[in-house]
Amino acid sequence: DVCSSDLNVPRLMLGHSYWTTTPLSELRNIRCQLRDTLDKHQVGFWQTETCIMGNDEEIGGGNGFDHTMKTALYVARIIHHDIVYARAESWQWWRAIGGDYKDGLIREYTTDNNFLDGRVEDSKLMWALGNYSRFIRPGAVRLSVSAFDQTGALIPDGDTDQQGLMCSAYKNVDGTY
C-alpha cells in the first residue's frame, strides 16, 4: 500500500504471458480474468514480455527460426487478445535478434563465436509486430467493434474468431485511425 499512495508510482501491473497462450480455449478466459481482477483495483496492465515457449504446440514450440506467416499470425492473435481482453496499454516482445529459435524477430547467422561477422534475416513476425507499432500509436484508444449476421442480428463476440478473423479498431491521439 505504500506504493499505491505514491503519486509518482503508476498504478500498473506488468506481466509476462508465458504459459497463458495455450490451450487456445483458455487464451481469452485468462485475459478476461486478469482484466476483471485489475479493474476491481483500478490498476492498468502492460504486457512486458512475450516469446514463443515449448507449450506453443500449434506452431511447433519455440525451436527453429520461422520465416513463414505461421508464427506471425499466432503472435498477432496473442496481441489481439492481450489488447482487447486484458486491456493491455503497452505490449512488448522479448528479443529482437536471435539464433535458430522463434523468439528472435531477426535471425542472426554468425561465422565466428564473437558475433563480429555473419549475416541477418528478417522474419514475418517482425513485420507483424511492426504493423501494430506503426498503426497503433502510444495513447491510442480502442474503438468498439460489432459484427452482425446477414439478418442484422448482433453476433456475440463476433469481433474475434480465434482461428480466423479478429477485428479491433483504434483511434490515435493525432486523430488518425
What kind of feature is each model-predicted range?
Residues 7-58:
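Glycoside hydrolase catalytic-domain groove-lining segments
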Residues 6-9, 38-40, 84-86, 120, ...:
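Extracellular/periplasmic catalytic domains that process cell-envelope and extracellular macromolecules
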Residues 44-157:
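Aromatic/acidic polysaccharide-binding cleft in carbohydrate-active enzymes
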Residues 32-35, 77-81, 165-168:
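Generic recognition of flexible, low-complexity loop/linker segments
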Residues 15, 93, 131, 169-171:
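Hydrophobic side chains in beta-strands
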Residues 150-177:
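Carbohydrate-binding surface patches
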Residues 2-4:
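Short, small-residue-biased leader/transition segments that mark boundaries at the very start
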